[in-house]
Every structure is written in structure tokens, then in C-alpha cells.
């Protein structure tokens, strides 16, 4: 017995958050009944997404895999981007199940990413409670003042009520900085720097 959103992430179909969105939009059924948040799957139940039966034979048999991949500039970390087919998933090796990204980088960034076939592991590593630090090397259009360096570590508003907060920011050389985060908000670094009227190069 598993909650459906957890089950879908366990078998590597998608992340737990994506599974929740599928359920909320009515795309998931168990035994022809639309699943609602919190519903559970029992052994023998027929699980479908958009009318397509999900193969659950790998449940509890699938070995956890993790790979590292260097994302290039211009690539997107998405399977469903109608505007850009240059997705990192086209470059990953074939496996049973699906690769799930552990965090992401935007189109205009490059760097190391981790991928796994286990949604629960991905969810655990991405969750703020895990406090896993990520390092970003960023070049800005101008040097950041000491006051603004302190402000970025205290936290600044970015968008939709969210706060961008750096664990550390260290000047490496001239306008280049090492930024340490333990959260993964969308465009957090770019929007935080924008708040202090700086741009990334």
C-alpha cells in the first residue's frame, strides 16, 4: 500500500511534486476511478495516467541509480518544453523507468547536475530539510559592495513573496563569486542579484 504520489516517484515516473500536479488535474485513475490527493494504491490495483496503464512490475525490484551530467549552455532541464527541444534528457543513457533531475539549472547556466531513477531519493535530496549545499560560480556586471554581500546572506525579496538567501558568497576574483545555497528556488541567484541592481554575465 502506497499513497499514489509517493508510488509514482518511487518507480521513477516523475517527482513527487509532479505526481501531485497530475493527481490534482484529474489525470490519474485507480481501477477507473479518478484519484484524489491522499488516495492509496494497493497491490492488484490498476493505475493509469491519461488512460495509459502504468507498469508497476519494477516496484521494489529497481536498483537505485545516480549519474552526474554536465549541463551545457542552451540546454533545458525539462522533458516538455514546447519552445526548445534541446533537453538534457536526450543526452542521458537509456534505463528502465525514467531519469529524474536532482535540482536544475536554467537555460542560460551550465554546470554539474545529478540524476536518479528514484523519485523518493530525488525528493529527499531537493527538500530544504536535507540542507544539501550547492555551489554556483557567478560572474557579475560589477563588483558587489560589502553591504550588499551581507544583505544577500540576510535575505532579499525575489518574487511571489519568496526570499532569496545565500548561505555564503565569496569573491573569487574581480567580478566572479562563489555562491553557496541550500535551497533551489527558480532563478534565485539572478533575481537576488537583480534586487541589488546587479546582473549575471
What are these regions (language model features)?
Residues 1-201:
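Basic, flexible Lys/Arg- and Gly-enriched helix-loop patches that mediate nucleic-acid binding at interfaces
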Amino acid at each position: 500500500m502506497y499513497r499514489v504520489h509517493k508510488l509514482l516517484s518511487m518507480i521513477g515516473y516523475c517527482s513527487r511534486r509532479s505526481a501531485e500536479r497530475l493527481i490534482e488535474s484529474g489525470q490519474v485513475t485507480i481501477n477507473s476511478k479518478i484519484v484524489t490527493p491522499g488516495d492509496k494504491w494497493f497491490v492488484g490495483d490498476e493505475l493509469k495516467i491519461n488512460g495509459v496503464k502504468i507498469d508497476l512490475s519494477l516496484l521494489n525490484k529497481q536498483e537505485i541509480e545516480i549519474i552526474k551530467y554536465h549541463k551545457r549552455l542552451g540546454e533545458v532541464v525539462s522533458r516538455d518544453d514546447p519552445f526548445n527541444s534541446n533537453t538534457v534528457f536526450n543526452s542521458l543513457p537509456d534505463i528502465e523507468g525514467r531519469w529524474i533531475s536532482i535540482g536544475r539549472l536554467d537555460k542560460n547556466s551550465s554546470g554539474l547536475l545529478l540524476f536518479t531513477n528514484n523519485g523518493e531519493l530525488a525528493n529527499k535530496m531537493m527538500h530544504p530539510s536535507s540542507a544539501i549545499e550547492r555551489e554556483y560560480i557567478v560572474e557579475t556586471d560589477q563588483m558587489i559592495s560589502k553591504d550588499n554581500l551581507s544583505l544577500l546572506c540576510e535575505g532579499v525579496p525575489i518574487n511571489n513573496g519568496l526570499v532569496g538567501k545565500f548561505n555564503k558568497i565569496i569573491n573569487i576574483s574581480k567580478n566572479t563569486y562563489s555562491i553557496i545555497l541550500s535551497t533551489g528556488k527558480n532563478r534565485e541567484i539572478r533575481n537576488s542579484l537583480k534586487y541589488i541592481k546587479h546582473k549575471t554575465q
